Amino acid sequence: MYIYSNTSAGLLFVKTEAAVSEYRILDSRGKPVCCPKLACVQEKDGWLTTLDARALEFWSVDSPVLYTLEANGESQRFGHMSLRSFQNKQVLLNDTHVYLLGYIRGIVAHDHPNMTGLSDYEAARKNILQAKKYGFNLVRFHSTIPSEDFLRAADELGLLVHMEIGFAYEYDDQGHKKNLSMNNDMWEKSILQYRNHPSMAVFCIGNEMHNSGHYPQVHALYEQGRALAPNKLILDNSGWGEYDRSSADIFCQHIAYFFPYAHHGNMFNVDDPWKFNGSAYDVELETETGIGAANVTAVREATPIRPTLSHEAMHYIDIPDYDALNAKFDAFAAKVGDDYLRRNGIKKPRYLTELPKLIARKGLTADMPDFRRASRSWKLMATKVFLEKLRLSHLCGYEMLQFSDCLKYENKNGIVDFFDDDKGIDAAWLRQMNSDLVLLADMEVPYCYVGDKLHVELYASDFLPKPEIMGTLTVKLDGEAIYTGEKFVLAGGLQRLVKLDMRMQTAGNHTLEAEFVSDGITVRNDWKLWVYPEAVCRTKPQLNIGDGALKDWLSHGSQESDLWITDTLDEKLLETLEAGKTAVLLYEHAAQRNTWQFQGALERFKPCIWDRGSNLGGVIRSKATADAVGGELFDLNMQPLLEAGSKVNLDEFPVKTAEHVLGCDKPVRDRMKGLINGVKDFIDQDTLRRFSHLFSVKIGDGQLIVCTFNLSRPEVPVTANFLQLLVDHTDVLKAESGMSVEAFRAWLEKTNAEGIRKEDVMNHFWEIDNKPVEDTLFWEEAQVNLAQMKSTEG
């Protein structure tokens, strides 16, 4: 028996092998519901009975109403619901647009076993209730078919489910992809088995199939899926595919591993991700022609023809408390016993024992509270930016890696831990960006000088089941109302509400708040603002720098000084220190002008994505520096200083330094070291490196202050205020300990003779920041043959 609905027409369809004569529909209390029979016709594969469903309530995420149909000796639970896409604009649940707020489970790298000590059904309920508490309405099972227990819980609690049957590529002798290998029987069997679940929303063939619209067998499976489950969405693959293919009802596209801020702030509104697979019809997207009057380049827009989800969104990790996790795991293991652990495939992962050893070995124990605090703040900042930028775009939702931390691997990119317990992220805070109705602020930058204007545009992203509501919008600055607008009528979807021009009068950190109140509905959101005083240096230092704009800005001081500022690590710098002077080194990693290099890396203003990257935020320990830049933890105000800057790795620095600004590295292995070289240990040189963006050390009788920030835009408020501190107040940055000039030179010579380490493969992709996602050219340049390895990540 198969039951599906046409909710707009108020009809219920029942497909059976034999004609339906007597039947009844019962609600959850066992009470009969009147649904008169309208028709019963024979089809080639059975009988189709049409019932009047106007007495039935819809099944939805917010109201998961379930019924039972009894007919022909069978009993089938169902929900009266429909799901379809409309053009390339909307996904419609019960004929009302819905914004899909998804998270990912499934393969071992993105999931965890049953860590409840209870049944699988109870574990599913816990996971779903937690996800809904944080605002999610969809779960994708990556390359996995979920259990009946999970789908039963999803039916009852109201969560949409995206399942994947899985596929593989066949390879030739050279390791090149040849054909698709798909389990067609499993595709049909899975749809037939699960299509009656109202929670079952998306039947998908598999993960990251390139050029799916070019395969006839994919089109055949799509058509079969449409026929077998007309009230579900059929998706050929998650991640790739042509923008104009007809083999899917919804697209789920790999947007980018960029961070949607500043120069990548428009990443959700450009067509670059669609150019990887291009057109299903092999049309050229860029052409050049020449005629007598002009040479013409035409670039065709790759506009997706279906509503689109952001594939494997965010992926942002932070640093957990390993001592607390170990204690929690051990207590759980003792409680449930060995038999339960064995039945559920639960083993204590290596990182829970190896990373605490590494932390102790590297002398980082005292720093870990700061690192955890900084990485959590950084992750929350990045999550907020990503979700709000996404909601300001044309996309219809996302699927996030991930809601629950993975047990097996060390990449902690979840909102809750691998027990599905809260880990300190406030659910109400996340729902400000992760609900049917959210308020958004669009601004170019969140900082300015005193007396300058900040232009802010406030939006509503409204995907309520009944979106047309009237309410009052109140905007506050630091708790004081600056705007109140009554009788705002929301029309549904993305809607600009008001434009604000705020001439900021007071320096310091501020909070902009917005609240929309309607009958029974209140939504809020808030945003940090930084307002800086004008900054002019009194000191006129001695300069040896090549950046013209910075050199000009630093040349306007009125007080001559022997402070030496250079952008080159060379013998001249050592001579200056030997003379007992204070020198500021504006260090650029791997710059050819340097005689020597420090161990270190390039910096980007973006979070670590799984095992890509080396920035988990930072801690500003110098109070004077924190006051100058506007906070003790890295935040949006630090973007001009961090982006395209550098950082020095102090792990092997020969003496203790005064560390004023610390950068947090990730506690995660590079997967390619394991896949290519078979190295799967946690390596001290690669893990939780002691990065610094600002530190001081005595060299001989001189003071060396090393700064790795990007100072190429001194007109930016945070940069100007930091420069004023750096130049006028070097005394607050002085170090007490150090080494001789001779010892420093010898250490530099030894370090450089041994070799400056390059970033691992995945970190290198993160730091070059020039492509949305790793492409064939990148892997070739990195000398990685993907056909010969099996990754742990999807």
Residue spans for each PLM region:
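Short, solvent-exposed loop/turn segments at secondary-structure junctions
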Residues: 108, 241, 257-258, 314-317, ...
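Secreted/periplasmic carbohydrate-active enzymes, especially glycoside hydrolases
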Residues: 1-142, 153, 157-161, 201-202, ...
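Short, well-ordered secondary-structure micro-motifs within conserved domains or adaptor modules
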Residues: 242-265, 555-595
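Short acidic, Pro/Gly- and aromatic-enriched capping/linker segments at domain boundaries
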Residues: 76-90, 291-296, 398, 568-572, ...
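A glycine-rich, often tryptophan-bearing local segment used as a flexible ligand/cofactor-contacting loop or short
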Residues: 568-655, 716
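Substrate-binding/catalytic cleft of secreted carbohydrate-active enzymes
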Residues: 125-129, 138-417
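Extracellular ligand-binding/catalytic regions of CAZymes and related secreted enzymes
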Residues: 410-414, 419-421, 448-459, 464, ...
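Short, Gly/Ser/Thr-enriched beta-strand-loop segments that form substrate-interacting elements
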Residues: 654-691
